[in-house]
UniProtKB/Swiss-Prot annotation:
Cellular compartment(s): Cell outer membrane
Membrane topology of this protein: Lipid-anchor
Keywords in alphabetical order: Cell outer membrane, Chaperone, Lipoprotein, Membrane, Palmitate, Protein transport, Signal, Transport
One Gene Ontology cellular component: cell outer membrane
Name of the protein this chain belongs to: Outer-membrane lipoprotein LolB
Lipidation (N-palmitoyl cysteine): C23
The organism's taxonomic lineage, starting at the top: Bacteria, Pseudomonadati, Pseudomonadota, Gammaproteobacteria, Alteromonadales
Gene3D superfamilies: Lipoprotein localisation LolA/LolB/LppX (2.50.20.10)
Listed Pfam families: LolB
Subunit structure: Monomer.
Family according to the record: Belongs to the LolB family.
Lipid linkage positions (S-diacylglycerol cysteine): C23
Amino acid sequence: MPVNLNHTLLLCLLVAASLLSGCSSTLGEQYQTLNVSQSKQAKAWELQGKIAVKSPTDKFSTNLYWFHLGEENQLSLTTMLGTTVLTLNSKPGLARLEVDGKEYVDSNPQDLLEAVSGWSIPLDNLPLWITGQVGVNDEISAYHDDGLIKSLISPAPEHNWQVSFLSWQQQSGASVPKQIKIERAGVQVRIQINRWQALKTQQ
């Protein structure tokens, strides 16, 4: 049975401390910051912002921290008080999800998140969209006047994802989205990127 994460967010019950505990101490602090002319040049980055998810069975908004290094992703959701509600660590072939003090493991992070929480979120493509890039099978449907992507369609089983890049900003020397809306039948995800920092990887 999926975990009621909206209930968890409201009551903040039995949430364990985790590796990703919010903005006061982040994984990105272990790396030197880097300026890039294009976001795709960054092999590692960290993001701080907010995420709001609305589905037929759930609705919530919370803080988001995301650390990306190559094919590895580590993200956490925290309340306004800094309490960690959910953490998800993934690398090829292995994903670990912590919520309500329990750990769940699967080979695919997207399948794991949906099985535990009931959320259908396109995690595989999010690192690309967050940095303003396009997936292999994505089709750009509109551009802003300045030439930056305004919207795209991403093929998916049952219903395609409609991705809207509502606004853009300059971070770490590159143009990256400020606000993104991702939606398909019955599901809407909004991400606000307050800080995106490119990081220098260790040689």
